[in-house]
Amino acid sequence: MSNVSLYQTVKLKKTKTNLRRKGFPWYYLDEIVFDRRTKNIKAGEIVKIQDSNLGKLGVFAFNPNSKIAARLLDVNHEAVIDNNWIRKQLKLALDLRKNLFKESFYRLVHGEVDNLPGVIIDRFGDTVVLQPNSAWADLNKEKITESIMEFGISNIVLNCMSRSRRLEGLNEGLTVIQGAVTEPIKVKMNKAVYFADVLHGQKTGIFFDQRFNHELAAKLSKGKDVLDVFSHVGGFGLAALVSGARKVFAVDSSAPALSLAVKGAEESGVSEKFETINSDAFDAMKEFFQSNRYFDMVVCDPPAFSPSKKTLNTGLRAYERVALHSSRLVKPNGYLVLCSCSHAVDLSKFRNACVRGITRAGRQVQIISWGGAGPDHPINSQLEQFGYLKSIFFRLLS
């Protein structure tokens, strides 16, 4: 079936033609030729894009209200984006995750990388949290929901609270649109049990992206005292305890998140070795330092200090500050794990900020490893923004 009569054709400006290779997932507003017909295209509509030489670049979701005007759906210029097409993309995404994980707790769809631009789906057993973060995703959320239900999902939470939606000019809101979700969901990960509040928690309730970094930190923490700063629901700390850490102190400014961490510790059978501190992270680290309290391992996994390029320098200074205060708490030959989820901060800039902070504290340092998000968060080879997560493992020698 041809889509010739279905989708309007949009052209790129001549000066932009050679700047992109076929398969690049985004085209920006200033790359698009806006003629009378283009100006009438509504947010979320599907278009075909050609370069100035009439080269066919594929089928795209279009939004004239966003800086990212076009998001790739299919490189096949004749693709028809219907329920069958959506179902096919979901199955491809599911097949990858089934090969990776025994338990059904993971990022099921990671936006453009899974050919569903702006769609984020986190799976919690028979429950999913759907984030339609683009105009096309929002316009087609019912079709996406129908397709999800065909894969054994009973409950669907529609989470429309992301920063990305605001950039797309979309409304906010959160509701259960299928089934029932009345309490935090038990999540099994890295031999620990966590509890995710998918209705009131941060983002979708838990951070699946850190799973493999949790695992490495846990291996290094056996028999050790661990300080887990910006702990949220106990991410690094609980993984460490079930792997043999001696004691974990979890610091977070959110009392509800820490209460879920305590519940996870109880369910994991490690509550006697788990202590929470409801405090500002910097205040807590300063207090530990003033009390001469030191740890074999310190982990800091803060929120995004630099969500956009405009906040890059401010964010880098904040990461340097985290590195300074946390490195002062690490015993000689101990470990420091520093993380960033800021899209605007690449690995090199983040590493340099961390090293500046550590050396300001007078510490001699080795980098023993670094990592990103797990394989349920794949990265588009042409879009480095999807490699947002950076976790660097340091050993402090003195």
Across the structure, where does each feature detected by a protein language model lie?
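Non-catalytic accessory regions of SAM-dependent methyltransferases
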Residues: M1-R123
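Non-catalytic substrate-recognition/targeting regions of SAM-dependent transferases
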Residues: V109-D122, D138-I206, E215
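Conserved class I S-adenosyl-L-methionine
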Residues: G223-H232
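Conserved SAM-binding loop of SAM-dependent methyltransferases across substrates and taxa
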Residues: V233-R246
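Conserved SAM-binding motif I beta-strand of class I
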Residues: K247-D252
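S-adenosyl-L-methionine
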Residues: P256-D296
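Mobile active-site "lid"/loop adjacent to the S-adenosyl-L-methionine
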Residues: F295-H325
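C-terminal catalytic and target-recognition region of SAM-dependent MTase-like enzymes
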Residues: Y335-S398
